[in-house]
Amino acid sequence: MRRFLVATLAVLGSQLSLAGAAAEAQAEQTDFSITNTNVSAVWNQTEWSLTTVDYVPAQYQSRISLSNGYVGASLAAAGPFFEYDLNQTNPDGDEPANVWPLFSRRLSFTTISGFYNIQQNGSGTNYPWLEQYGYESFIAGIPHATGIIFTFGDASLDSTVDPSEVSNFESSLTFKTGVATWAYTWSPAGVSTTFKVSFKAIFSRVHPNLIAVEAQITPSADVKGKVTDVLDGRSAVRSYLADKGLDDESTTIFSAVHPDNLPNITAYVVSTAKFDDKYTDKSSRVEASAPIVSTNGTTIGQTFDIALKSGQTATFHKYVGVASTDKFEDAEAVARKASKDGTSAGWNAAVSEHVAAWGELMTEAAIDNFTDPATGHLPPDADIEILQIATVANSFYLLQSLQPDGSGLNDNSLSVGGLASESYAGMIFWDADYWMAPGLNLNFPSYSKQISNFRVKQYEQAKKNAAFNNYPAESVLYPWTAGRYGNCTGTGPCVDYEYHLNHDIAFNLVQIYNITQNKTWFDDGPRQIIESIAHMTGNLLDYNETTKTYWIHNMTDPDEYANHIDNGAFTIASSADLLFVVNELRRNNGEAINETWKEMSENIEFPTAASDITLEYQTMDNNVNVKQADVILLAYPLDYDQNNYTASDKLLDLDYYSNRQSPNGPAMTYSISAIVANTFSPSGCAAYTFTLNGFLPYLRAPFYQFSEQNDDNVKRNGHQNPAFPFLTGHGGANTITPFGFLGLRTDRPNLFINPSLPPQIPHLKLRDIYFAGAGLHITMNRTHTTITRFSTEGVPALTDKYAGKSMPIEVGTPGDNQATFTIDVGQTVYVPNRLYFENITYNGNILQCKHVSSTDAYAPGQFPQAAIDGAIATAWQPTSNGSSSILIDLSQGGSFEKVSKLYFNWGSRPPRRATVSFGNETASDCHGQRQLNGKVVRVPVTVKPNDPFDAAEAAAAVVKPYVGNETLVSVPGEAWSGKWVKLEIEGCWANGDGDEKGATVAEFVVVGDGN
């Protein structure tokens, strides 16, 4: 059953209720999936805010992530406090851990951009022997700066407040303003007074060194207590104390830390308390001590006596300045000035300018919009409402981790979890260049340039890496992971691993140049990097005298389940494309091309099976299990078309590898599947199924942050500790509308689109995008795409290539351009969409892409829609092998047909039993679930596997296209389609050895008698 209230969502004013009442306390870790009602999330479409009424402490998914691109923090469920995760099943058991390579305790992290330490190794690594050549560089924390703690008697209000003491809870994050809030009633045990409390926090979008917090408290009776401004050192992991103290004759405290093993680098955190004089005894100020604050050596706090009055609200503010010597020579002075200036300006001024700055970024024009342009309302569809919320959240979470170009603070790229997370040790992976940058490049190139600037900054080190590994002069090798230096390390090898990172970097540099046309920037670093990567690639490719082709040996493709293989398809195809691109750049600049690179590009060893399936690597068998998107990346973003790699080959690969995808892979994979399906599918609507799979299983309530895994429970997800928040997932999802639905490509000199909007989505207004320095407003409906060009004069870092003249727009399938439109500034053109989804995959099928529902729980990403989307690349799978069903609605148009046959593709897990029912009426049962009613015609189906899986056979067999288990049933008698069709399945032929998972249905087809 799809247990989330958006399925029966009611629009009340501007609010969409996405979940019901607070879930009861659970023995296990709470399931924060948005497809549950365990944790509430209420969306306000006008304010772009999410609000929860459920207080779920000590679990990372419930924390708000806030940052401003320079400093960021994860804030506790109870308020802007530091918080540890706790073991929800056994208080004495193992502490919840973060992901590789640290496997450290989950906590509310806070740091400064680029504040990396050095240390010999981590708890996890890739190549331990590389540790002898250079230390690791992991993100280091700073003291958690946002806490204001109230104490009455022995009771203190911090992140550990017991849920039994909290009522009327409400916490929200507003994406338009970047303001986080908490409000509730606190009834501390042993204290006769109750308190209405609220907190607000901002990380200033205007002043990158400033954090501001407001706390308000209203007692039910006169009461005396204490208030503490704390800088909590427990988040300063991998850092050590430089200095700390309380300033004399003021209300300022500070804590300064060095990242481990770097005494020449110092971060300063300076907090000034501006507490309500009416209720605060300033003369009582003392240094805070346990148990109010932690005993961590970098913790510092200041405590004041307070006397509150019944029913009167007391207000307390703190203004925190943060700076490190990485970017500010006199970091202490910068931090102190930020704190002082914030205090002088006051809360209202700080919030006002912060909100205005976010308002300039999070505009209606900057966000994809699924509302009906005639009514301004979202369609009454739960999934589209989720897509709308997530689209807003994607942009916010990515942008809040970035500073704009020209700030002097934008050269540390974007880590997997951003500035509020230590997941993956805060290191930089291909995630930034390949997954986060493309969507941001389109409408926020000034911000996305931070990703490119990082690679430019570490260019010299990349040249040293290549020289160390005996590559010729002018070559570069970027390490798989990078921190402060970009050297080759145990976690970040430069050779014998994922060479494709270098190509990913180059392709992003080319694409941001194509978008901005900022040639001054491009020729001052990026162009040289791309050339150097070509030199490296030319040395990496090894000529095979037997095959007369170029090979890559001992490497890893994006699928990290397969290491030390030859000729990874994505890497070797990327090598060929990179060499081609570099020669094109040379040709366009009037330079001689490199003939050797041309010959290499045209003669790579492209691993292909006799069945035309692209092999992920040279020796792959039919038993492959893929971690994440790999071969399908050839279709997009690579748009590879050499070696006679056709559109039909790309579709064949999509079907094959979709059925080889591990359920434990990371979140971004299905964004690629959605784009590829919408580009190359000749029929059906699998692109929409993949789109849902790119969002729904990975989004977490209450604040729509991505998790790396579709199931956060390590006992069920292959023992994977998910990265959180997973900005890579946000980045991938942020590409689906422009690159999938619009079919945009930015890897070529002219704007290229191939529009097709899935039939489930009636309207889409895309974010405004830039290309070749020009600006474009774009809207889509079912049949057409409308494009209006606007002037970009005055937009920083953009040079309109077509200023004063018409701009060409190529429309068609990549590699097969079909039409060219031209557009002037202020002009509108109308481009017909591809309506391929109107084509029926199985001739005569009356169910394809109709509305389908189910009241039964399904496996993550295995949606009921998959059973009728016209593709075997997707499948519906109930969570259990008990009786489960789907109900297809045929009542909306069309005439009834006599049914002649039924066809099923069960995928890899056929059920034991199946029944198809036809009827014209439905009614709710005692559980409120819709069931067929009245006259019902039932057709029992005998199911026997005809393509059973055998691991030994698969390992020995040649690689062949995916088919699945099939059943064809002729329907005798007078069975008519009716208004409703129901498929019930039970059992699973694959069950055994404790496997109680449900069967799969890849395609369910009903064929009318007229076909």
Regions found by a protein language model. Give the residues of each.
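Active-site core of glycosidic bond-cleaving carbohydrate-active enzymes
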Residues: 428-458, 502-507, 511-515, 524, ...
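Alpha-helical scaffold segments in carbohydrate-active enzymes
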Residues: 392-400, 454-461, 528-540, 581, ...
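Acidic/polar, glycine-enriched structural segments that form the non-catalytic walls/loops
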Residues: 20-424, 815-817, 825, 829-849, ...
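Fungal secretory targeting signals
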Residues: 1-24
